[in-house]
Amino acid sequence: MQESLTLQPIKLINGTLNLPGSKSVSNRALLLAALSEGKTRLTNLLDSDDVRHMLTALAALGVEYHLSSDRTVCEITGLGGAFTASQPLELFLGNAGTAMRPLAAALCLTDGDIVLTGEPRMKERPIGHLVDALRQGGAKIDYLEQENYPPLRLHGGFQGGEISVDGSVSSQFLTALLMTAPLAAQDTQISIQGDLVSKPYIDITLHMMKAFGIEVRNENYQRFFVAGRQQYRSPGDYLVEGDASSASYFLAAAAIKGGVVRVTGVGRNSVQGDIRFADVLERMGAIVRWGEDYIECERGELHAIDMDMNHIPDAAMTIATAALFAQGGTTTLRNIYNWRVKETDRLAAMAIELRKVGAEVEEGNDYIRITPPAKLKAAEIGTYNDHRMAMCFSLVALSDTPVTILDPKCTAKTFPDYFEQLARLSELA
C-alpha cells in the first residue's frame, strides 16, 4: 500500500518561511569547495537526498568534511586540485542530476576507473550530450548499459581544448564542463549548439565560480572561454541562498489564498533565476514586494496567462497548478520541453494529474494548456517519485476540495519538511 497524505481545504495562508538552502547552489558549492585550495565553511546548506548523495560521493573520493548536527553547516577541507582515485570506485548518486552531471565531468580529470550509477530513473535521464563534449576534450568514457544514459565508466583523459555541446536539453551539461575546465591541462573553448535552455542556471554557475576565484569569458551564451591550469581558491565562508524553486509553492499559495506570505533567504539580488517566478505571479494579478533577503506575496485576483517559461522550468510547474485558480480561460506554458527529462516526464505527468482534478488539458511536445474547471474535484495525485509534483499539487487544497498526495515523502529530494511548513502557515476551512 502506497503511503498517502490527505490535505484538507485551506481557507487562509499567512506568515513567514525561512527557506531551506538551494539544491542547485548546495551541490555546486560542495564540489567547488572540494576542488579548492583551503577550507570552506558552507552555511544554510540544504539537507536533502540530493545533497547527501553528493556528500557520500565526496567522502568516497577522499574529501574530508565536518557537518553540523542539523546538517546545514559543512566545513570542507579542499583538495587543492582534481580528485585522485588510486583504486576502482563505484559511486551511487540516486536520482541527483546536480551530482551526476558535474561529477561525471570533474572525474574525467583523474586517471582511474570510476563508475557512476544511480536509481532506475537516473538511468533514463540523458547524459549523451555531456559525454560527447567530454570525449571531444580527450575523456575516455564507456556506457555500461544503454548508449547515452548512465551508468558510466570513467577513465580520465580530459585535457580541455575546443568543445561544442548541445545546450537544448539541459544546462547542467554546460555547468559540468564549465566547473571542470579550469583544472584541465589546456585552455577550453566551449561552443553552444542549439538554443541554450535554463540560462539563469548558467548564471548561478558563473557567479559561484567567480566566488571561488575563477573568471570565465562569456560571449553572449554562445561561446565560453576558460583558461586551463588554474586553481579554485576557497572564499572562506560561503552562504547558500534559500531555494527559489522551493519558494514558488508558498508565494503561489499566498497569491491564491493570502494573507501575506514572506519567504526569506532569497531577494532582489539573488543569483537564482527562479526568483523571476514572482514576476509571473505579479503578471497574473498577485501583489509582490521585494527586499534584499525576502520576497513577499499577497493575494490578488489571478488571471490566465500565455508565457514562454524556458527561463524558469522548475518554478513554471507551480504556475501549472496555480492556473487552476486563474480567471478568464486558458493558461499556456510554452518552451518547456526540458520538463520531459527531469525527475520524471513532467509534461506527461502534469497533464495526467491536472485532468484528475477536473482541468481540461492540452499536452504538446513542448507546451501545456490548462483550462480550469468551475469546481475542482477531489483526487488521488500520483507523484512519480518527483518532489515537485507533490509540492505543486498541494496547492489544490487552497480550494474547497481536499486533495490526496501519494508518496508525500518524495519531497525529501529538496524539501523534507515541506508539508509541515505548509501546515504551519495554513488556517483550515
Swiss-Prot record:
Function: Catalyzes the transfer of the enolpyruvyl moiety of phosphoenolpyruvate (PEP) to the 5-hydroxyl of shikimate-3-phosphate (S3P) to produce enolpyruvyl shikimate-3-phosphate and inorganic phosphate.
Keywords: Amino-acid biosynthesis, Aromatic amino acid biosynthesis, Cytoplasm, Transferase
This protein's pathway: Metabolic intermediate biosynthesis; chorismate biosynthesis; chorismate from D-erythrose 4-phosphate and phosphoenolpyruvate: step 6/7
Top-level EC class: transferase
Annotated SUPFAM superfamilies: EPT/RTPC-like (SSF55205)
Binding positions (3-phosphoshikimate): K23, S24, R28, S170, S171, Q172, S198, D314, N338, K342
Residues that coordinate or bind phosphoenolpyruvate: K23, G97, R125, Q172, R346, R388, K413
UniProt-annotated location(s): Cytoplasm
Pfam families cross-referenced by the UniProt entry: EPSP_synthase
GO molecular function, one term: 3-phosphoshikimate 1-carboxyvinyltransferase activity
Gene Ontology BP term (one): aromatic amino acid family biosynthetic process
Catalytic residue list: D314 (proton acceptor)
GO cellular component terms, A-Z: cytoplasm
Keyword field contains Amino-acid biosynthesis: yes
Family: Belongs to the EPSP synthase family.
Catalyzed reactions per annotation: 3-phosphoshikimate + phosphoenolpyruvate = 5-O-(1-carboxyvinyl)-3-phosphoshikimate + phosphate
Major location (coarse): cytoplasm
NCBIfam families registered for this protein in UniProt: aroA
Domain of life: Bacteria
Protein name, entry field: 3-phosphoshikimate 1-carboxyvinyltransferase
Its EC number(s): 2.5.1.19
